[in-house]
Amino acid sequence: MNNAGKNMYEKLTIRDKFMFGKVTKNPVIAQKMADLLTPVEMGEVKGVEREKFLQHRNSSKYVKLDMYLEDENGRVVDTEMQNKSQNRVVQEELPLRVRYYQGMIDQEILSSGTDYIFLKETYIIFICTYDPFEIMLCIYDA
């Protein structure tokens, strides 16, 4: 790789879609990231999917999950990179978006006729490059 190409990669941060994809594609790095972002220590990663597409009916809104990770204990982590310049999310919309993603993930996990006890422990994380609620906190959780 020439110096120009090397310098281009050195300037990228995890907020860049390309770099986020490269980093989260690696199960070891994805697990460390999940350990840092969740209140639990993740087990060994069983699988990582980038840009996982979920749509349960043709007429329903689909979601494309940036990084979908499942560990050996059945925990699921969806990590989304949210750049203000790429996609403005209003304060009222972000919690509703999380709710919708949770519902879509739950539908993916639970087959028809399966008891609700089999829903998995799930974490949905939005890494925002801005303060989405403008009250000067680094972490918001529900």
Predicted regions and their residues:
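Elongated, amphipathic alpha-helical interaction scaffolds
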Residues: 1-142
